[in-house]
Curated annotation (Swiss-Prot):
Species of provenance: Enterobacteria phage T4
Source organism, top-level taxon: Viruses
Name recorded for this polypeptide: Uncharacterized 8.7 kDa protein in cd-pseT intergenic region
Amino acid sequence: MLASRFGRFLMAWHHETWAIVIVNSGLVGTSNGQFCVFTSENRAWEECLKLREKNPDVELVVKKTKLPLPWKTYE
């Protein structure tokens, strides 16, 4: 019982976002020292296309991801 409750709270410790991901490493890309994550898929693709033009040797895609939150949330 405790494990199932704990698991439920773990699911709340993230925020779903759209991230620009570097294909070769699987890591979220950065630009000007900030992670490239967006609440809008369209906005993420707009920025991804701009970054592709500036960095043609780096393969970038947009993926839906879960961003861990540094604090605990409750339902």
